[in-house]
Amino acid sequence: MVRLREIPRTAAFAWSPGANPLLVTGTRSGAVDADFSDETKLELWDLKLDSQEQGLELQPIASITAESRFYDIAWGQPNDEHPRGVIAGAMENGSLDLWDAEKLIAGEDALISRTTKHTGPIKALQFNPLRPQVLATAGAKGELFVWDVNDTSAPFRLGTAAAHDIDCLAWNPKVANILATGGAGGFVTVWDLKTKKASLTLNNHRKAVSAIAWDPENSTKLLTASSDDTAPVILLWNLRNSQAPEKTLQGHDQGILSLSWCQQDAGLLLSCGKDNRTLIWNPQTGERYGEFPEATNWTFYTRFNPHNPNLSATASFDGKIAIQTLQNTNPSAAPAAQNNLSDDDFFSKAASQPQAASFSLPRAPAWIERPVGVSFGFGGKLVFFNKVETAAGQKRSSKLQISSFSIDSDIGSATDKFEQAIQSGDIASICEEHIENAKTDEEKAEWQVMQTLSESDGRTKIIERLGFIKDEPVEEAKEAESPMSPEPKQEDSASLKPNGGEAKKHRRVVSMWGDGDDGEDFLSEIAATKGAKTDNPFNLLSVGNTHLEDQITRALILGKFEKAVEICLKEERWSDAFLIANCGSKELVEKVQTAYLQQKRGSPSYLRLISSVVAKNLWDIAYNADLADWKETMVTLCTYADPSEFPDLCEALGDRILESGNRKDASFCYLIGSKLEKVVGLWVDELQETEQAALNEEAGDSTFSVHAKSLQQFIEKVTIFRHVTKFNDSETSLTEGWKLAALYDKYLEYADIAAAHGQLSVAQKYLDLLPTSYPPAETARNRVRLATQKAGAQTAVRQATPAGRTTTTTSSRTAAPVGYQQPSLVPAPANPSSLNPYAPPVPAPVSAAASNPYAPPLAPVSAAASQYGASSSTYAPPQNQGYAPSGYTPPTQSYAPTSVTGYGVPAQNFGQPSPLGGPPKATAPPVQLKRDGVWNDVPMVTKAPPRRNTPSVAPLTSPFPGQPGIASPPPAGPFQQGAPTPPPPPKGSAPPRNVGAPPTGPPRPSSVSSNATNPYAPPPPAAGLQPTYGVPPAPRTASPYNPPPSAAAPPANRYAPAPATQQYTQGPPSGSGIAPPPASGAYTPAPPAASQQYAAAPPPPRAGFSAPPPASRPPGGGPPPAAGAPPQQQAPPPAAPPKPRYPPGDRSNIPEHAKELVDILSRDMQRVASKAPASFAPQVKDTQKRLNILFDHLNNEELIKTETIDQLAQLAGALAGKNYDIASKIQVEISKEKTEECGQWMVGVKRLISMSKATP
């Protein structure tokens, strides 16, 4: 819980009926204020829960003086005449006063009427919840009146005068004419207003009835509470069988004064009483959920807020009305100082103060619990639950169902169809279907291109699709060539002619040797004829030749083709140059071609085309060709481009076309060039346009369906394109800078949609196409991988559920938390009698950390025994048990030395003693326990002073509660006989240490840690969990080891904090391990442990064994030698002369290197002592005491080594510099590494660090 506000009044109160939480208070009759004021007031209070500036204590918003004090007060529902309702007061003088709440807030005269019909004080009153104008009042001498608040002049009376007062009444919330009353006579009367007679009387065994509450859901059930201290119980009655109560709720120590049954959740009940406690219950099951912070005086009135039951208010005679939340599940703060400081002298003198409480409901309240819920599960699953109707008092349960779900069935079918087509490899049919269903020319052209690319000779088909056909004859040139022209030309027979339209004319170089095939045949025949002779002789160097021709002839004669070609090029005799070059090398031909094309630059375009083809440089065409002829350019690229350059050339041409604004033709170029990264950007834009067009059609599809279908078309297009082009993504190993990032995002989106429709394999397929380190896909990959794991690989065994099938599971909300195990050794025994002050204590069981967010928090258990815990009998036969489960046999084991178990229970050993007992095995270290907040965490937590809590009452597991349970040790009180007297300790053993006095009163064991933090107390160690070994839970009783009460003994201090337990208790200082006998039969407590809780003690031993102490050391320091070990047969070394010891408090012999640390610690201790609050004086005094122990060790130069002194000097320096973190770190290191040197003084050092940090 969290205390939100406090009202500093001892008053009766009532909640306002509206949503805004207001409280009205009236000075309580019979109470005396701290200032002994006799002033009586009616006041209104606004909680201001939404104001962060409002402090804990409130101030009234309206206040008027009343003529008499109040026994009870009620606030009725608003109506037309009274918009804020009517406030009714049950006055001590017997009058019924009514006030208008609206006028009271406005500061006007608010009194409506004052009527006196009662002859004595009015003890109780209540408005009828079903008829708000009806009011019932009850009081002294059995007077019971029913009023109409609109006309208070004529009330009618129920019943007749009686000897006993009526102290409480309650209207039935379901039946308007039923009223129940109760009083000091011990009877509960149920009245029927229709007959104006008592219809039923319940016998409460003549125990005074102080409170009545009707079941908010069942009109025949009610609760009654008794104010009798001898029977402080709550009884649940069913009027259908009124002979005996249906259930009894026990938990209060003294009489109960008030009940409040939550109207929104019949499983919640508040009760408060004379034991200063406010408890919360489940009245249907009788389970007690927890306890609110205990007050310092009687709590006489408690109520849930009628509008917001998470709020409740409790009034007590300590002068406060506490407004608090139902519970607090924030992680508990460090336990208060009393849980940390283990010195019994400190605890015996600690100031009495209330304890804090914290609890968590094991289930969510009804106003938070959802009766039905649904959630989409990954993989196309729909998970939903609904509440299963159960009878009152039974555990609430829900029916959980899992079914398949599809947002749009067409999406799933389209995906399946496409995947099947891909697996069949029928790409052509897919393309044909898309071509037929294409809605735009652009989409149709894209699918046609992909269909073409899927064929074997794709580039040839592309040329034909562009309208060109290879090897078609070309028309002869019509132009007349001049006979004198050095370069006669003709049409190139290998040129291309468009299929449709006017044919283009292309020129070609014509040989000077004439046209036709006759010359070629002739020359070939001559070349092939050996020794051919003609009648036409010629001169190599003719007289008619020019000088240039003779030079060419001479060069040819000598085989100098290069020189002959140079002469021809100089004279621009291109035909001769080409002819001669053909006789030479390939390089020579290329040289002539280059010179010719260079000379003819600017001539017809075919020469530039042939220049690019000859030079194998088609980039000039791709970058510079006119875009009006982009088809011819593409055909040229398809005809001449090298396969390695073809994609890039297509990309360059496509980029130019795209820049001109023609997306369709650019897409064509990208498709031809297999440039997926380019075409994807265009398709993404096309996807958005397609979606928008589909939405504008208003076909009735949802936005998601339209998007999913458009994305499906996009994915199919990309998939087919990758298939036909055999695209290989080379960027999957990159970590950033992906060119296909836009495509990856669509793949991821498509995988999510496929997974949402239950197609996990399809989703996995497309996730595998993404780069390995693609951050946006991490979550999707993990989800798909987990969802596709086989059942055998999971930790929990589950049944696989086919798609479309519904799995139903019924689960209980109050199931045991995960990780909890029942004790497996022995069953928990029955609670020992609370009247036996010498019964051995039994700690509460501790379970493992619970996963249930509504489970109650686990109490931190310290594996230790109380310093005042008496040892059990050395050996004794087991007692006769009242109950033993079938098959159980008490264990027998050899004699072991007496020890105290790790859970504070004296060990019990059965069987006859044997000579020696072996050492125990070390137990496992405690498990770290950390609880997080759950369903109703609140952002603001107001710290309260440390308060103690009360453990829950353990269940009865035996039909004979008065007898100890199985494996429980026999009671061994200080006055009992029967156990053999232990022998005295051997000579030479270390004497027992001094034992402090027991606490002044029986401390109440605390089962729940406080959430308040003591600024002067060091933070406690983390709470750990130890195995229970079948140890039973502890009852709520007085300390079992206190001496019997006497007439002169002071009363027990019920508010004193309980002494902290220790983690490790050594055996008695005896070589035999047996404690010495008590003198004259007087009770002697067990010696305290040498190692305190914060001294890094070893783990506790197992139950039934003694912890093996360390080896023997001199008496001034450590523990005694190991119990039960045989003596060492060695010659003792010569004893050194004993070093003189100085008296306590002497500081004159402290070594020089330790004086500075002593000065620093002393100064800081004085500073803390001067500024610490008076309530923490015991802690300060105890810390000073422990530091003096350290100084005495340093003064005597004993126990503490030089290295440890150096570390303490560093700690002191850090403390002087206010570096508390460093000081704490050094302290922890010393505690861990120098355990044998750390005694009681280390607790003082640790505490000083915490106090110094908290003191300004």
From Swiss-Prot:
<feature type="repeat" description="WD 3">
    <location>
        <begin position="117"/>
        <end position="157"/>
    </location>
</feature>
<dbReference type="GO" id="GO:0005198">
    <property type="term" value="F:structural molecule activity"/>
</dbReference>
<keyword id="KW-0472">Membrane</keyword>
<keyword id="KW-0968">Cytoplasmic vesicle</keyword>
<dbReference type="GO" id="GO:0090110">
    <property type="term" value="P:COPII-coated vesicle cargo loading"/>
</dbReference>
<dbReference type="InterPro" id="IPR001680">
    <property type="entry name" value="WD40_rpt"/>
</dbReference>
<keyword id="KW-0677">Repeat</keyword>
<keyword id="KW-0256">Endoplasmic reticulum</keyword>
<feature type="repeat" description="WD 6">
    <location>
        <begin position="251"/>
        <end position="291"/>
    </location>
</feature>
<comment type="subunit">
    <text>The COPII coat is composed of at least 5 proteins: the sec23/24 complex, the sec13/31 complex, and the protein vtr-7/sar1. Sec13 and sec31 make a 2:2 tetramer that forms the edge element of the COPII outer coat. The tetramer self-assembles in multiple copies to form the complete polyhedral cage. Interacts (via WD 8) with nup-20/sec13.</text>
</comment>
<dbReference type="InterPro" id="IPR040251">
    <property type="entry name" value="SEC31-like"/>
</dbReference>
<comment type="similarity">
    <text>Belongs to the WD repeat SEC31 family.</text>
</comment>
<feature type="region of interest" description="Disordered">
    <location>
        <begin position="870"/>
        <end position="1150"/>
    </location>
</feature>
<keyword id="KW-0931">ER-Golgi transport</keyword>
<comment type="function">
    <text>Component of the coat protein complex II (COPII) which promotes the formation of transport vesicles from the endoplasmic reticulum (ER). The coat has two main functions, the physical deformation of the endoplasmic reticulum membrane into vesicles and the selection of cargo molecules.</text>
</comment>
<feature type="repeat" description="WD 5">
    <location>
        <begin position="204"/>
        <end position="247"/>
    </location>
</feature>
<dbReference type="Pfam" id="PF00400">
    <property type="entry name" value="WD40"/>
</dbReference>
<dbReference type="InterPro" id="IPR036322">
    <property type="entry name" value="WD40_repeat_dom_sf"/>
</dbReference>
<dbReference type="GO" id="GO:0030127">
    <property type="term" value="C:COPII vesicle coat"/>
</dbReference>
<keyword id="KW-0813">Transport</keyword>
<dbReference type="InterPro" id="IPR015943">
    <property type="entry name" value="WD40/YVTN_repeat-like_dom_sf"/>
</dbReference>
<dbReference type="Pfam" id="PF12931">
    <property type="entry name" value="TPR_Sec16"/>
</dbReference>
<feature type="compositionally biased region" description="Pro residues">
    <location>
        <begin position="980"/>
        <end position="989"/>
    </location>
</feature>
<feature type="compositionally biased region" description="Low complexity">
    <location>
        <begin position="1049"/>
        <end position="1060"/>
    </location>
</feature>
<feature type="compositionally biased region" description="Pro residues">
    <location>
        <begin position="1030"/>
        <end position="1048"/>
    </location>
</feature>
<dbReference type="InterPro" id="IPR024298">
    <property type="entry name" value="Sec16_Sec23-bd"/>
</dbReference>
<feature type="repeat" description="WD 8; interaction with sec13">
    <location>
        <begin position="375"/>
        <end position="403"/>
    </location>
</feature>
<feature type="repeat" description="WD 1">
    <location>
        <begin position="5"/>
        <end position="46"/>
    </location>
</feature>
<dbReference type="GO" id="GO:0007029">
    <property type="term" value="P:endoplasmic reticulum organization"/>
</dbReference>
<feature type="region of interest" description="Disordered">
    <location>
        <begin position="789"/>
        <end position="832"/>
    </location>
</feature>
<protein>
    <recommendedName>
        <fullName>Protein transport protein sec31</fullName>
    </recommendedName>
</protein>
<feature type="repeat" description="WD 4">
    <location>
        <begin position="161"/>
        <end position="201"/>
    </location>
</feature>
<keyword id="KW-0653">Protein transport</keyword>
<feature type="region of interest" description="Disordered">
    <location>
        <begin position="473"/>
        <end position="507"/>
    </location>
</feature>
<keyword id="KW-0853">WD repeat</keyword>
<feature type="compositionally biased region" description="Low complexity">
    <location>
        <begin position="800"/>
        <end position="817"/>
    </location>
</feature>
<dbReference type="GO" id="GO:0070971">
    <property type="term" value="C:endoplasmic reticulum exit site"/>
</dbReference>
<feature type="repeat" description="WD 7">
    <location>
        <begin position="294"/>
        <end position="334"/>
    </location>
</feature>
<dbReference type="GO" id="GO:0005789">
    <property type="term" value="C:endoplasmic reticulum membrane"/>
</dbReference>
<feature type="repeat" description="WD 2">
    <location>
        <begin position="65"/>
        <end position="109"/>
    </location>
</feature>
<dbReference type="GO" id="GO:0015031">
    <property type="term" value="P:protein transport"/>
</dbReference>
<feature type="compositionally biased region" description="Pro residues">
    <location>
        <begin position="1097"/>
        <end position="1143"/>
    </location>
</feature>
